[in-house]
Swiss-Prot record:
Residues 62-75 have a biased composition (Polar residues). It comes from Aspergillus fumigatus (strain ATCC MYA-4609 / CBS 101355 / FGSC A1100 / Af293). Belongs to the aegerolysin family. This is Asp-hemolysin. Keywords: Cytolysis, Hemolysis.
């Protein structure tokens, strides 16, 4: 059975692709703390390479999940780059530390030719939760 403490620190990035013909892809997925996991199962760890295989088709979506490790007093800190083909859209980054009162979530290094909308997320204590990150191309 996994540690409730570590698994209480989690984030699900729900990527929503609002582009009409381009597919969103993920590159440079990395974690300083925690682990990646399959949708709905914190015990089913996946690799950064598995995360980088995920895509969101035009008009579709995909989830990227991370949490703290069981039996460790650590949360999750990490991120990944969002791409449209060879064009970087921005870098999704979060910090959901164990034992801290504040969380952080942002999409930085944004490309001016795209819009990115970040949904609500839990800033204070516990899990960041599920965060919608919707991406589109400016006209």
């Amino acid at each position: 059975m996994a540690s409730v403490q570590a698994y209480a620190q989690w984030v699900t990035v729900h990527l929503i692709n609002s582009m009409s013909s381009e597919t969103l892809s993920i590159q440079n997925a990395s974690l300083s703390w925690g682990k990646w996991y399959k949708d709905g199962d914190k015990d089913a760890e996946i690799t950064s390479e598995d995360v980088q295989q995920k895509t969101a088709p035009p008009g579709g979506s995909v989830n990227v999940n991370s949490c703290g490790r069981s039996d460790a007093s650590s949360g999750t800190t990490g991120g990944f780059d969002l791409y449209d083909g060879n064009t970087k859209i921005g870098r999704v980054h979060w910090d959901c530390p164990w034992g801290s009162k504040t969380n952080d979530f942002d999409v930085g290094e944004r490309n001016k030719n795209y819009w990115v909308e970040i949904g609500t997320w839990n800033k204070y204590g516990g899990a960041i939760g599920t965060v919608d990150v919707e991406v589109g191309r400016k006209r």
